[in-house]
């Protein structure tokens, strides 16, 4: 006998009514020096520079103040924007500390946080966005169904834990106290596949949020 409760521990679960999917990524993840170097190569291209500029433009349309980029990739956005950064990759942490740009977002709230292709990697994303006092900026793959997820290049069993539909993502942020002020497909138009970018503004404090 094979229990459903055991099956779902190793497979994608998708909840259409929530617009949300979950994959149990193992704790041993590939965030090391090679990972950092891979993103250095991706950033040092015309497309990489266009994407960074698009992200800067999004932030600047809505916010001016203290910003921390969570999951810095190779640091291109941090360097271009002149903001702080947070990472779990030792290479990223070292890069930030050398430039006096490291900020542990879980120690104290920050005016705004950015998560460029990052939120889907975080085990408890609600704890991360809770540390934003005013704004959260995100780029993330979006999906329509479980079949869309499993057929996508963004279905990464060693990295991506969370999978949202567009509606599910906005709903999830609303439940966490944020209003969607803008979304666009600029990164997909530049050449990426199935990526949407969002600007969320805090409208309720964490202690005002209920689960009812």
Language-model segments: residues:
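Conserved N-terminal segment of class I S-adenosyl-L-methionine
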Residues: 1-112, 116, 126-131, 149, ...
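Residues lining the SAM
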Residues: 116-119, 139
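Helix-to-beta-strand junctions that scaffold the AdoMet/dcAdoMet cofactor pocket
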Residues: 122-123
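Conserved beta-strand signature within the Rossmann-like core of class I S-adenosyl-L-methionine
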Residues: 134-145
């Amino acid at each position: 006998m094979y229990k459903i409760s055991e099956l779902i521990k190793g497979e994608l679960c998708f909840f259409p009514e929530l617009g949300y999917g979950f994959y149990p990524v193992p704790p041993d993840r590939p965030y090391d020096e090679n990972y950092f170097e891979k993103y250095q190569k991706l950033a040092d291209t015309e497309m990489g520079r266009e994407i960074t500029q698009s992200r800067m433009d999004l932030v600047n349309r809505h916010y001016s103040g203290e910003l921390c980029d969570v999951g810095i990739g190779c640091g291109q956005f941090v360097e271009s924007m002149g903001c702080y950064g947070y990472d779990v990759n030792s290479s990223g942490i070292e890069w930030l500390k050398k430039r006096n740009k490291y900020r542990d977002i879980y120690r104290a709230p920050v005016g705004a946080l950015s998560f460029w292709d990052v939120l889907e990697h975080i085990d408890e994303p609600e704890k991360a966005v809770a540390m934003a006092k005013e704004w959260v900026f995100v780029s993330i793959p979006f999906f329509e169904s479980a079949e869309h997820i499993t057929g996508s290049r963004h279905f990464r069993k060693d990295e991506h834990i969370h999978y949202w539909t567009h509606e599910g993502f906005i709903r999830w942020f609303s439940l966490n106290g944020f209003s969607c002020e803008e979304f666009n497909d600029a990164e997909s138009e530049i050449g990426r596949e199935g990526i949407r970018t969002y600007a969320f503004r805090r409208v309720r404090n964490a202690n005002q949020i209920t689960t009812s």
